[in-house]
Design a protein with these regions (language model features):
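Right-handed parallel beta-helix/beta-spiral solenoid domain characteristic of secreted/periplasmic
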Residues: 131-145, 151, 156-200, 212-247, ...
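Extracellular beta-strand/beta-solenoid scaffold signature
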Residues: 145-148, 174-180, 197-204, 227-258, ...
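Parallel beta-helix/beta-solenoid
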Residues: 153, 157-158, 166, 180, ...
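Predominantly extracellular beta-rich ligand-binding scaffolds that present long acidic/polar faces
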Residues: 360, 366, 383-495
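C-terminal accessory segments
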Residues: 477-533
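Beta-sheet-dominated interaction scaffolds and their linkers
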Residues: 534-565, 637
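Extracytoplasmic
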Residues: 554, 576-586, 591-602, 610-625, ...
Length: 797
């Protein structure tokens, strides 16, 4: 466990430079120039509220910095209830905090006390869901002719302008420009639009305010990736080569891009299947499409959306930000991100990096991503990550990092991150305390990952307590925490509610305004919780299904959906990507009705599953109003990737792992039908002072050759390598639990602080004979070694 943890931290550490240091896309066809602009930070001279739909930011200036207590109630109703203590910013002499778990379109009263006296009072009204529509514009082939709709219109607070489309009409273009551009418009609604295409971005929202994008279907934007070229080809500039031989950027290619602006809502949208795809950390920092791109907007709400890429066409981040280490970066301030489903990412499910000033991320389901929520670069704060579930983390190769990412030490002086009542299952390294970020980590449930970093908690008075996690040396559950299994109802199928006898039940700490007032469960699931958090009383009996395919056979599996509530009725339809043609779901449509239960059956199509070892997909039970319940599908097959992927000796030289000419380590022969030729060797690390395993090979031509080892998971996934008697360098191997090729970087390759310039290492070799030295850490199972000028085909399948 410790060694695996160290390796994952080594890979995770590569993430820390991604934010401000990552290049913005350049101008030109299919790109958008994001011009840096310092936003005007507000000055608060009195108690100020910035309401959202489900919460409200508050700001209270206090030059003396004396401690305060905050309480609220629904206007004129009941007793005041305490609010979690806000954080104090010494530079701005300002208290900042959030009130959560509020109702929409509801009036609330707040009072602030200090030293037993009320020092301020105020009122606010949360945002409501339905604006008044003054005008509706129906898009069709008659008025959408040029491939781009530019909106500059300005509605009014009591008269919004709504854009929708005629039945069956799909907004399309040739992918050289956006489908919709909203420039400095106000009071605009995009409702029930279907968009397929778009250039680098499908929908641009620039310096606009009071914009709502609701129940839209977006797919297919960006350049089709007929040929994707990664860092090792482009010399530090991830992207692809277009039909004219020009390099194009793939990063920041968004379904919806928010370029500054204020009071923007994105809800109930299905954003899926971009034309391009992101690379894995196997090559360099991931670069590629995202569903939503946030460039310093304020008062943004992203809720109830399904952001679903596909396993071979993954997001970089499902939700990405710019200026990750600027105090106005990313979602900037006063944002709510809740009730979303985000899946299939090469880096993060969501980047909150940047200002994170009263940014609230809660009630979401995060899945199948290298990292879950990134809060590195919390430059202003406070941010709140609470009540979320994390399942089946990992990129397309199964590599995984931190569930909640805190990699960098770049954080604001008085920034605070609250990580409360989240539930985690499956791979990942949990939460690492940070030397420069104060973190309050409480009431979280882990089954394989954990909170670590006890030695650095003291620097910012960080807190970890009332957490449940596995018993490992580095774990920091807290004084009132427990090192035990969480007792999830059915973690294998993603059901993270606690069992009746679970140590999570009624074992949590009461956190004012964030948890029930008594009987608090540790983790995301209190009584009656359904995630992702959505206003529909529909509950699936599982969140994911796991299949095995052998000899082109796999048994169907069923699950049930229960509809609770009273007088609830809505049609639904099974909705999934065209890339998920390898499974069927029945019934494909129907009606959800209160008090009724529906059984669904998922059947695989093994005849379409002969190209990968692992298949991953997802489908939605989606209603016409855009609300849905997601279910993910994972299938292990008996597919074995061909070992020798190049037959051209001028591109690749193969060496049988048993053909070393010398070496002091112990060797065992392994008979395995899935190894090359049915045989592999287990190479053991030599004793101190012992010599490495030495291999001789001949290179037919001068060139740059990447070292690849065909291996499988084993003890300590690292080796030391050298060429022709040079210095031995460490190389981390990203291994699978089956035979697959792993890149073994030349550790002598210089790394810059810019991860976009990192690339898969290589050796520059002259034609003729060479000697390769390999020393495993612990032991390694290896069947083949390759030196190749074209590593792309060696990707695990």
């Amino acid at each position: 466990m410790k060694t695996k943890f160290i390796l994952l931290l080594m890979i995770s550490a590569m993430c820390i430079w991604a934010g401000d240091r990552s290049p913005a896309p350049t101008t030109g066809a299919g790109s958008r120039a994001w011009t840096p602009r310092k936003t005007d930070r507000p000055v608060y001279s009195k108690l100020t509220f910035v309401p959202g739909f489900a919460g409200c930011s508050f700001y209270f200036p206090a030059a003396d910095g004396k401690a305060i207590e905050v309480a609220f109630r629904e206007a004129g109703r009941g007793e005041y209830k305490d609010v979690l203590t806000p954080s104090y910013n010494r530079r701005e002499k300002l208290w900042r905090g959030s009130i959560v778990n509020l109702k929409e379109n509801t009036s609330y009263e707040v009072k602030i006390s200090s030293e037993g006296k009320v020092v301020a009072e105020g009122k606010f009204i949360t945002k409501g869901a339905l604006p008044k529509i003054a005008k509706t514009i129906v898009l069709s082939e008659k008025n959408f002719k040029d491939g781009t709709l530019t909106i500059t219109a300005k509605g009014k607070p009591d008269g919004w302008i709504r854009y929708t489309c005629a039945p069956g009409f799909v907004l399309k273009n040739d992918r050289t420009k956006p489908l919709i551009v909203i420039n400095k418009a106000k009071y605009i609604v995009l409702d029930k639009l279907v968009l397929n295409g778009g250039g680098h971005i499908a929908v641009e929202v620039n310096y606009a305010s009071n914009i709502r994008i609701t129940n839209c279907d977006l797919s297919g934007w960006g350049r089709p990736d007929a040929k994707q070229y990664f860092d090792y080809v482009l010399g530090g500039k991830p992207g692809y080569i277009d039909a004219n031989g020009k390099q194009r950027s793939t990063n920041y290619s968004a379904g919806i891009a928010l370029n500054y602006g204020d009071n923007i809502l994105i809800e109930k949208c299905y954003i899926h299947d971009p034309a391009g795809h992101a690379n894995s950390w196997r090559y360099s920092h991931p670069a590629g499409p995202c569903a939503i791109f946030a460039v310093c907007p304020t008062s943004t709400t992203v809720r109830y959306n399904d952001l679903v890429a596909n396993d071979l066409g993954r997001w970089n981040d499902a939700v990405e930000g710019l200026y990750n280490f600027g105090e106005d970066g990313g979602f900037n301030r006063d944002a709510e991100i809740y009730g979303n489903f985000m899946i299939f990412c090469q880096d993060d499910n969501i980047e909150l990096d940047g200002g994170q000033q009263n940014v609230r991320c809660f009630g979401n389901r995060f899945e199948s991503s290298y990292c879950g929520v990134s809060i590195q670069g919390c430059m202003s704060g406070p941010c709140y990550v609470f009540g979320n579930m994390f399942i089946s983390m990992g990129d397309q190769y199964g590599y995984h990092g931190q569930n909640i990412k805190t990699s960098t030490n770049g954080s604001g002086v008085d920034a605070v991150a609250y990580v409360l009542n989240n539930s985690f299952t499956g791979p990942g390294t949990g939460f690492s305390m940070n030397r420069l970020l104060k973190a309050v980590v409480m009431n979280n449930a882990y089954d394989t990952s954990y909170v670590s970093g006890a030695k650095v908690m003291k620097y910012q008075n960080s807190v970890s307590d009332y957490n449940v996690m596995p018993k490992v040396k580095e774990a920091v559950p807290g004084k009132n925490g427990k090192l035990v299994a969480p007792g999830y109802a059915n973690a294998k199928q993603g059901v993270l509610e606690p069992k009746a006898d679970s140590p999570l039940v009624k074992a949590g700490k009461v956190i004012p305004n964030f948890t029930p007032e008594k009987d608090v469960n540790i983790g995301a699931f209190q009584k009656g919780t359904i995630l992702p958090l959505r206003p529909m009383p529909v509950k699936t009996s599982v969140n994911k299904l796991n299949f095995k395919v052998a000899n082109k056979k796999s048994a169907p599996q069923s699950f049930k959906v229960k509809v609770c509530g009273k007088n609830y009725s809505s049609p639904f339809a099974v909705t999934k990507s065209a890339t998920c043609d390898w499974f069927d779901v029945v019934p494909a449509s129907g009606v959800f009705e209160s008090g009724k239960e529906i059984e669904f059956t998922v059947t695989l199509k093994p005849e379409l599953m002969d190209k990968k070892t692992v298949y991953r997909g997802a489908f939605l039970l989606r209603q016409p109003d855009g609300l849905s319940r997601p279910v993910s599908i994972y299938a292990d097959t008996d597919f074995v990737q061909k070992a020798r992927l190049h037959n051209d000796g001028n591109k690749t030289i193969y060496i049988n792992a048993e053909d070393f000419i010398s070496g002091d380590g112990k060797v065992e022969v392994i008979n395995d039908k899935n190894a090359d030729g049915g045989k592999a060797v287990r190479l053991y690390e030599a004793k101190k002072g012992g010599k490495p395993f030495v291999y001789e090979f001949t290179v037919p031509a001068d060139g740059k050759y990447h070292l690849m080892l065909r291996s499988r998971s084993g003890h300590r996934p690292r080796v030391r390598v050298s060429m022709d008697g040079g210095k031995m360098y460490d190389s981390a191997l990203a291994l699978m639990n089956y035979w697959a090729w792993a890149t073994a970087m030349d550790g002598s390759a210089k790394k810059t602080s810019n991860p976009w310039s990192w690339k898969v290492g290589y050796f520059t070799l002259k034609a003729g004979k060479h000697k390769l030295n390999i020393m495993p850490y612990g032991f390694k199972d290896i069947d083949l070694i390759a030196l190749t000028s074209d590593p792309g085909p060696f990707e695990p399948r």
